[in-house]
Amino acid sequence: MAGRWAAGKPRSIKALAPQPLGVYSAAMAFNEIRPSDDQPFGSFAPHGLVARIIGWTRRASDSFLGRKVAYALRRLGLNTLKGKPVDIEALGAQMRLYPEGNVCEKRVLFTPQYFDALERDLLAARIREGFSFIDIGANIGAYSLFVAARAGRGARILAIEPQPEIFARLTYNIAQNPFGTVKAIACALADKPGELTLFLDPANKGESSVRILRSSNANAVRVPATTLLALAESEGYERIDAVKLDVEGAEDLILEPFLRDAPESLWPGFIIIEDSRGRWASDLPALLESKGYAMIAQTRLNLVYERTTS
């Protein structure tokens, strides 16, 4: 098994010792990898019409017309691919992307310039030497690898993803890059440790939550869970520079107990949160403001906070 991963630069993955929480490493995730992920990176390089479509969509402007044309071409590209993956560089990293059935991968493949552009700009502006970043709901690693490509060898990045198939894609993508700063952990974060039911949307494999999804076709699996504080302490974090949370409405279950129980020295300076205000059980924006955070940006999908007091 180790030899098969060696072709994909496994040094970029920090292997984890087995733990009761169900945290496991890239090599342990290999059982979840589909046959196409057993082939060397580059086996699915885009060519012909698909390559041209990707070039066109990535060059599209941010205007209304530019986006409209890009999305139309993207549909053509998806139909042409017929479910096949694509090996490509995106956001400064090499990735194998499966655009059919995962909105995140579709966006990153065809239109990375539109992918959380403001959020990424704000995050990139705050990267410094020794940057520490926790990516909660890491999906296939877009944010984690974006930060790793810019933060240098002294960074510490945790990519948290509980969905087994998506975790396998995440670890594969990490392994294709030489950064050596990203550690993938397969567990859910919640308000207490244990085992939780994770709901999965078969139409969008990157959408999973410990809260019931709006999809009528949602499936469910049991996954290990821990709290953000327990995770940070077990990893030896003394400072967290930034956190991104995209867990389909369960962001409050993670942040509320963390801000209640964690020492202030561990509170992140910068937070990107998926805007799920219609699903949160508590007023998370009010809680963040009471803890000294100010909202510095609001986009179609996310809220961005920065701590103004320490």
Language-model segments: residues:
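Phosphate/nucleotide-binding beta-alpha loop and adjacent structural elements of enzyme active sites
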Residues: G8, S12-S310
